Amino acid sequence: MFMAKTGNGTLTLEKRANHPGSGRRKAAAYQKGRQLQPFETAAVKKLIGEGPYERPLLIEYLHLIQDAEKCLPAGHLHALAELLRIPMAEVYEVATFYAHFDVVQDGEEKPEPITIRVCDSLSCMMAGAEKLIASLGAEDMPQVRVLRAPCIGACDVAPAAEVGHKHVPKATVAKIKKVVEKGDFHATIPKYQNLAAYKKEGGYTVLGECLAGTRTVESIISTLSDGGLRGLGGAGFPTGRKWTFVRAEKGPRFMAVNGDEGEPGTFKDRHYLERRPHQFLEGMLIAAWAVEAQEVFIYMRDEYPAVLEILDIELKALEKAGLLKHTKVSVRRGAGAYICGEESAMIESIEGKRGLPRHRPPYVAQVGIFNRPTLVNNVETLYWIPQILEKGAEWFAGMGKNGAKGNRSYSVSGRVKKPGVVLTAAGTTVKELIEACGGMQDGHTFKGYLPGGPSGGILPASLSDLPLDFGSLEKYGCFVGSHAVVILSDKDDMKDVALNLMEFFEDESCGQCTPCRTGTEKAVKLMQSGDWNQDTLADLAQVMRDASICGLGQAASNPVVSVF
């Protein structure tokens, strides 16, 4: 403000004009940016319901819009930002991070309403996925789009495809066209053991004893530790020790179940959840009781629509039966991001954010969901808990061999006659797994194998007598990880195999750190050009291992180094 003299000599108080760059701007006479229309807000409310709206549920809201609209219209995203009272940029960065969301700007055409996803990961490619993709592209199918997709967890029925939410095992053009013509794109729910059947065989007895005080937390942790139960999602960390670490942290505490088994070649969790979901759920509820978790978040991949529906049905049954009184259970649906299998990235996604791995320390056992101590366990790890506690540590530990403890669920796919989940002793060899799967396919000779999915590297047939368990393969530059075993034959070019795996990692890199983002891209370009300079690729691999934030970048080069 300043004083100005008028013509009659009086003084008036006037407002000084802001000069450019002063940092003080006049308020805009109109709102900047895209204007939200009332009908857009009404449309979003109709899909996600009336409030109160929660910021951590952003991804769930995006799913509801995507499912209904077959895309994410810009106006709906704007309305969602207003309802959540967060910046539009925050909604946009999440929506564009996940592969299963299709953001459509104003004026852009919506994608075709029917989406066919064909898996192009290793097992499916060996089973003819490339030819299937090309054939589908040549078909005249109105209102249909065909997309390549990373592993959908159906490697035992390769080549696999998904039409909407319906899986098509051993997919052919004819099978897929039949689904499209029929118009039923909902998941096919397999026959599974429900709550009544599980309780009839004694299910939830152990949980009941825990809640009644008959069993102590200390005795349960001791039994799991003596039995040798380890994390079966890939890391192999001792379960009892992890529970002890979380219990030592001050509450409130949370628990997260990692059901995002996106490692190509892995399908064991789906196998159990589609057959005996309550054995897993009882193990989960025992774990929640042991660490006094006030809420459990089951993070399940979007590629498992049948599992998501089963969990919805059976959690409601548990609620009705009064078995969820000691904790709250919520299901969070992934959206096509492999990186969310990394525990801290999964926690970011549970909080409704981009799935970017966190820097550690602190570890999630100390600072996890909503910055509280969090127990993270894999589906199969929890699956074995009721039986171990019922039958004893000696029962479980005694099933291993070659120095290993317990049993293992090996997901076996590739060039075997009968792919599937092989439940057998920990420490089993690949030679024994091939025999359990009916031997090699006719006309194929065993050449090599992936012992633990793409991250685990590639081993030659000459090392077929190695026991497959945690710690047994590291001296060969490999590891067993999630026990995803892919069998290769003399018909497979190892360089083509390694390129397929590296292309997967390039596509799934979250892009947060340069060694992984640029390293995978550079490796793919070198491999595609035919320039397999061993020194260059080895140097690149070393940088990725040493400097990447998480396991994706650290392990991405394993298949490449394996074929030198």
Residue ranges of predicted features:
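Flexible inter-domain linker/hinge segments
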Residues: 179-226, 371, 377-392
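Ferredoxin-type iron-sulfur electron-transfer modules in oxidoreductases and energy-metabolism complexes
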Residues: 26-116, 120-186, 205-226, 250-255, ...
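Short amphipathic, charge-patterned alpha-helical segments
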Residues: 283-285, 426-441
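Accessory "access/gating" subregions that flank catalytic or transport cores
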Residues: 210-249, 411, 423, 442, ...
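Hydrophobic alpha-helical positions that pack around
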Residues: 308-426
